[in-house]
Amino acid sequence: MKKLWTWVGFSLFCGVAQAGPQIGVGVVYDYLDGDKSTYMKRVFNGGTSTAFVKVNILEIIYNEDGTYQEVPLQNQASAVARDGLMASPARLIVPASGVQGTRLLFMGDRDKERYFRVRFVPVVPEAEDEFAISAQEREDYKKERVEAGIKVLAGYGTVFFVRPKDTRFDTVIDDNANRYQLRNKGNSVVVVDEFKDCAAQKENDCRPTTKHHIMTNRSFSFDKEAGREYRFTLIEGGEKKAIEIKG
């Protein structure tokens, strides 16, 4: 599990630069509720030139030992007998200071929760990339980048959770004198959001705030320390509960 989250978020595909397209995708964890089949994801461009963005999707398959593999899906253009997540459109042209959206559509089996990595990758458009621009526009864009000295293309990776059709939450709490544990006995991920571990008498003496996803049949726990307080928000789908524990 821990390795999965290290790949989430901002990643650099080349060197370092300030000019050119600079995309953002908002939150890096998205959740599709059991009664929904589509989700709109917006891509923002805060840069100085147009961003040509490819949307790539892999399914995350977990093994019994907790390790996982990322499996490529079928061709985005084919929806025949599809089982997985697709982006429409899978190619975005986002103007400077503008925003464009792609619709993430799930088709297939929802008896259990499924997980996908969605990558938003800015590229220098080539003919095979299937962006709706002319050959001359492609060449003009390349020339513009060279003249501006742009050497970086920065993209984002997000994790997309597809909840089961019949979503059921069942979080079991085990709170004893020395240890606190949450165990997920439901069939969909629950979230421990903004987990804070702070000194009881010093409000600003806190360890780094963290976020944890508790998968089905997994648990999250921590040892209580005297003189410390633990605060977080437990999120089960649309339900949120603030929890405070004293060490």
Locate the predicted segments by residue.
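Bacterial N-terminal signal peptides
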Residues: 7-15
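Terminal connector regions
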Residues: 58-60, 107-167, 230-247
